Amino acid sequence: MEIKGKKILVVGLARTGVAVARFLASRGAKVTVTDMKEESELADYLLQLEDLDLNLELGRHDKHTFLMSDLIVVSPGVPMDISPLLMAKAQRRVVISEIELAAAFIKAPMVAITGTNGKTTTTTLAGEIFKACGVETFVGGNIGNPLIELVTSGNDVAQVVVELSSFQLEGIQRFRPKVAVLLNITEDHLDRYASYQDYIDAKLRIFENQTVDDFAVLNVDDPLVAACAATVKSRVFPFSQRKELAEGIFCSKGIIVYRWQGSELRFDTAAFKLKGVHNIENIMAALASTLLSGADPIKAGRAVESFKGLRHRMEFIREVGGVAYYEDSKGTNVGSVVKSLESFDKGITLIAGGKDKGGSYAPLADLVRERVKHLILIGEAKERIEAELGNLTDTHKAATLEDAVAIAHRLAKAGEVVLFSPACSSFDMFKDYAERAERFNAAVRALAGGDCR
């Protein structure tokens, strides 16, 4: 990809925009950065660019700048359907994501992981497996480290593991991972997409440029994902918790079995620190993607056994009066909450709600009816969730997250579980899911009595 001397527009600042701008400037591009936020809101990021000779257009998007650019690189937080981008595309300007830009300069084989839920856990675990095998690995993408940072670092790694959101996949053209993983697809981000099908189509682009020399690792327990097997050009490697596979990776009676080209490997889930039905899927996907990439089976198994998981994902906080409190603030959509509820039997007090993302809460109905003893709702979405689920169990509404914890403490009995799994984003009441998690954890730790960890 030729960059020197080109007029390149970076849309959206934040961490990814900064990394892209610095890379482009280092390669001799004429860089302009545009963001709808004002200078005062972007002060921390602007400090990281003050040594560069570039143009800034803040608080607005100038359509003329879009039309005069040779290349437009869009940060993940910017919708691809804003009018300046649509106009630029209509005028045949090249519009790509940071992922597409970075991949053009990376020679190492790549494992790319997407799905509605489980991406970060699977990506992190795959990276840990490669590292346990002595493979120098870059782990990044939607997980927090922009892929372009690998290019700017100059590090010659042997392997790349990248987490991809639907937003990042919207802007690819030639991006081609050696192993592409699709974990699941459920309704999400319908506040950004015109339809559910548009969201699905964005996810499926991960396979777009693969060939028969590549692998598609597919969760065949998910009907939407399983259907991909008939359309992808790469070799399909399935994984399942529900059925035995002649070739692929599956879990039966607590044993994960990996079968490929006549060989068979077994991993006992009893030895794993990472618990939860949904995490078995994540583990199988991580094992499949790394073993297909040449990871040592024994070292891979040891890496899985020692992996404890990530914060804010079904994290045990403490026990109070015999009631176990779990924080799952990363459960920002209905599909994720389904998996979390499936990890417990009856007697759940569920705290949910936040900023509505546009999807239906109906998929939670059976689990709420069968397993949720008390439902406590917060945030902008509480009225809508109550309308869809409130008649299925004992339901309460709370003004704040702290109030919700207090209500849960009053209602839950010894031997039961309080689960905070919102099914919504956090932006109505909090900066992000991490701040929301810390507020919940602080409220739980403030409860009198119990075992605090």
UniProtKB/Swiss-Prot annotation:
Pathway membership: Cell wall biogenesis; peptidoglycan biosynthesis
Q: Which Gene3D superfamilies match?
A: Mur ligase, C-terminal domain, Mur-like, catalytic domain, NAD(P)-binding Rossmann-like Domain
Report which reactions are catalysed by this protein: UDP-N-acetyl-alpha-D-muramoyl-L-alanine + D-glutamate + ATP = UDP-N-acetyl-alpha-D-muramoyl-L-alanyl-D-glutamate + ADP + phosphate + H(+)
- Which cellular component appears as one GO term in the record? cytoplasm
**Which superkingdom, per the lineage?**
Bacteria
For this UniProt entry, the molecular function terms from Gene Ontology, in alphabetical order, are: ATP binding; UDP-N-acetylmuramoylalanine-D-glutamate ligase activity
Record keyword Membrane present = no
Instruction: Provide a GO biological process annotation.
Output: cell wall organization
Q: Where does ATP bind?
A: G115, T116, N117, G118, K119, T120, T121
Ordered alphabetically, the record's keywords are: ATP-binding, Cell cycle, Cell division, Cell shape, Cell wall biogenesis/degradation, Cytoplasm, Ligase, Nucleotide-binding, Peptidoglycan synthesis
State the NCBIfam families in the record: murD
Main function? Cell wall formation. Catalyzes the addition of glutamate to the nucleotide precursor UDP-N-acetylmuramoyl-L-alanine (UMA).
Family statement: Belongs to the MurCDEF family.
Q: What is this protein called?
A: UDP-N-acetylmuramoylalanine--D-glutamate ligase
